[in-house]
């Protein structure tokens, strides 16, 4: 077993019009017991307050990088999100990481989420991909 603290992961988050949720996502990533080495947030042309909320939430944090893609308005379900992820992934070329995460910005993670995920990858070398469950509070 390797040290969990030595495990490095990078996160790419395509985001569009998530003003309702993005602040909670930012807080939950900042509160992780094992933080990512880099978090790339790609705003895919939001028309709401998402860019402002992101800017306020991550200002001055050197391991978080944000950028915006302005599109022509045509969105293909799933395809534009993949394109935004690819743009973010290219910005990780200078980053050393063991795992890459695609994280939506409408989720809230418990503080030990990535620590637990990394522990499971460490315990079972055959694991190659992981996903979380969905729980909605009413």
Where are these predicted regions, by residue range?
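Conserved short acidic donor-positioning loop in nucleotide-sugar-dependent glycosyltransferases
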Residues: 29, 44-45, 57, 105
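A conserved acidic beta->alpha catalytic loop
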Residues: 43-52, 72, 107
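Conserved donor nucleotide-binding strand/loop of the catalytic core
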Residues: 51-83, 87-95
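Short beta-strand/loop segment that forms part of the nucleotide-sugar
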Residues: 36-45, 67-69
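Short, acidic, metal-binding catalytic loop of nucleotide-sugar glycosyltransferases
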Residues: 27-36
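Cell-envelope/extracellular polymer assembly enzymes that use nucleotide-activated donors
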Residues: 8-10, 38
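Short beta-strand-to-loop acidic/aromatic patch adjacent to the donor-nucleotide binding site
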Residues: 88, 96-108
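Conserved donor NDP-sugar-binding/catalytic core segment of glycosyltransferases
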Residues: 108-138
């Amino acid at each position: 077993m390797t040290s969990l603290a030595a495990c490095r992961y990078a996160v790419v988050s395509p985001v569009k019009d998530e003003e309702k949720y993005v602040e909670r996502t930012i807080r939950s990533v900042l509160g992780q017991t094992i933080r990512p080495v880099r978090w790339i947030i790609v705003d895919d042309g939001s028309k709401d307050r998402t860019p402002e909320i992101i800017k306020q939430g991550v200002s001055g944090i050197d391991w978080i990088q944000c950028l915006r893609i302005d599109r022509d308005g045509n969105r293909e379900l799933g395809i534009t999100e993949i394109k935004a992820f690819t743009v973010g992934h290219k910005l990780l070329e200078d980053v050393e990481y063991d795992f890459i995460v695609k994280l939506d910005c409408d989720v809230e993670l418990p503080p030990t989420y990535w620590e637990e995920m990394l522990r499971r990858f460490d315990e079972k070398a055959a694991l190659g991909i992981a996903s979380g469950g969905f729980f909605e509070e009413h």
